[in-house]
Regions:
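Short Lys/Arg-enriched alpha/beta "domain-start" segment
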Residues: 1-53
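Active-site mouth loops of central-metabolism enzymes
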Residues: 22-29, 141-159, 209-221, 267-279
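Alpha-helix-loop-beta-strand connector modules within alpha/beta enzyme cores
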Residues: 42-47, 186-213, 246-267, 311-328, ...
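Phosphate-/polyanion-interacting regions in eukaryotic proteins
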Residues: 43-49, 53-121
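N-terminal small/glycine-rich loop or linker at the start of catalytic domains
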Residues: 123-153, 199-208, 257-271
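Active-site-adjacent beta->alpha loops and helix N-cap segments on the catalytic face
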Residues: 124-132, 180-201, 219-222, 241-257, ...
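Catalytic alpha/beta core domains of metabolic enzymes, predominantly
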Residues: 224-227, 232, 236-357
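Extended, intrinsically disordered, low-complexity segments
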Residues: 367-409
Length: 409
């Protein structure tokens, strides 16, 4: 089969097909030829016609069924893929095709998985509803922080910062993505001491608190760390899902630990930042949800990591829209957030998300407790419909934060 034979604009996708939307930028060929090349090389074809192709093999050919300028849609028969094997799926639809000579750029913008494939994975164990049950917080966004500085603190200082964030009002404290088990803060010591701080904060505040400890490591070591967290009364683990890999994530989820899985997307921009080439965050979010994370960083519309509103909305939709009965995943907004940005965040995300602030809490000139209080005060003010500037007349922590960083409506 020639590349153009994989283009069939009359084809109507079946309910069992895997559907991919690509943006193609051809190099020296037509869009149709480039599109056919993507479909061929990601299914049964190659650069020349073959004598070994049988009629039953031709039935497995991917089909380009829609072309609109440079946006193409390809349908893949489900028989091309092994259930419960995400590497197999991605090696086809996002593998060698990115290196084709006839393509200047290629971007996988969206993917639809049929129910049969979705249900072969475990999916989220807790999701939005389960997380809210654990924390007993139902009507507001969750407030979290990342221990700062991200690296360098010794274990006791790390646990002390966590304690201050919790008593100040944070629901969640998490490790940063590059803290694992360095000499200055070994994993097991950190888990024990920080969970002790959590227990003390819960006793003093009467509120539930959780610690997201980063267990990212070689897969077997990661499983050992998850068991250690569970054995010591932890309820959450954090995984850098792209650097440890989807297979490691799936192995973790298949253990069915009674642990909420928080997914950090460190490294995503290597795939997502170039709007013409790579893989969209929406695709990554769908894959993470299917495999089984419970909450995931999705970007934010403000702060140092801000992204286009439409893109962040698509990421949230990938986590929350109906998908073969999977639980909804809780979006996490993070990156340069502070109390003055809370109204804009809540207006966009509504209530079901995590406000994850590091410097915007620990950078408060009066310390971490004051920074956490200011963030909670900003949330309370916004939900009450009171302008932050007016609320700050009563709450000095918020007043100081607004003077330091300003505010955005």
């Amino acid at each position: 089969m020639r590349y153009v034979d994989f283009v069939d604009l009359r084809y109507e996708p079946k309910g069992t097909d895997v559907l991919c939307t690509f943006n193609v930028e051809p190099e020296g060929v037509s869009v149709e030829e480039a599109a056919g090349g993507v479909a061929a090389e990601s299914s049964i074809g190659t650069w020349t016609e073959l004598t070994t192709v049988k009629p039953y093999v031709e039935k497995l050919a991917a089909r380009v069924f829609d072309i609109e300028r440079n946006s193409i849609k390809i349908a893949y028969p489900i028989e091309l893929f092994e259930p419960r094997n995400m590497p197999n799926i991605l090696s086809s639809v996002s593998g060698n095709v990115f290196g084709l000579r006839t393509l200047k750029n290629l971007r996988l913008n969206d993917i639809h998985f049929p129910s049969e494939l979705v249900r072969s994975f475990k999916g989220p164990k807790y999701g939005v509803a389960g997380i809210r049950r654990i924390l007993r917080v139902y009507e507001r966004p969750l407030v979290g922080t990342i221990i700062k500085p991200k690296l360098g603190l010794k274990t006791l200082d790390h646990s002390r910062v966590a304690y201050e964030a919790w008593v100040g009002g944070c629901d969640i404290v998490k490790d940063d993505e590059n803290l694992s088990s360095q000499r200055f803060n070994p994993f097991e010591n950190r888990v024990v001491k920080t969970l002790e701080s959590r227990d003390r904060a819960e006793e003093e505040t009467g509120a539930r608190k959780v610690y997201m400890v980063n267990i990212t490591a070689e897969t077997n070591e990661m499983l050992k760390r998850a068991e250690f967290v569970l054995d010591h009364g932890g309820e959450y683990v954090m995984v850098d899902i792209l650097t440890c890999g989807f297979s490691a994530l799936q192995t973790l989820r298949q253990q069915d630990f009674d642990l909420v899985v928080h997914a950090h997307r460190a490294g995503h921009a290597a795939f997502t930042k170039n709007a013409k080439h790579g893989i969209s965050m929406r695709v990554i979010a769908k894959i993470a949800r299917i495999i089984g994370v419970d909450q995931l960083h999705v970007g934010t519309i403000v702060g140092k990591m801000f992204e286009a509103r439409g893109e962040v909305a698509e990421n949230c939709d990938a986590l929350k829209k109906e998908m073969s009965g999977l639980r909804r995943v809780l979006p996490v907004a993070s990156g340069g957030l502070h109390p003055g940005l809370v109204p804009a965040l809540i207006k966009f995300f509504r209530k079901d998300f995590v406000i994850q602030a590091g410097g915007g809490i620990h950078g408060h000139r009066d310390g971490t407790i004051a920074g956490a209080k200011a963030m909670r005060q900003a949330v309370d003010a916004t939900l009450k419909g009171v302008p932050l500037s007016e609320y700050a007349e009563t709450y000095r922590e918020l007043e100081t934060a607004l003077k330091m960083w300003g505010q955005q409506a």
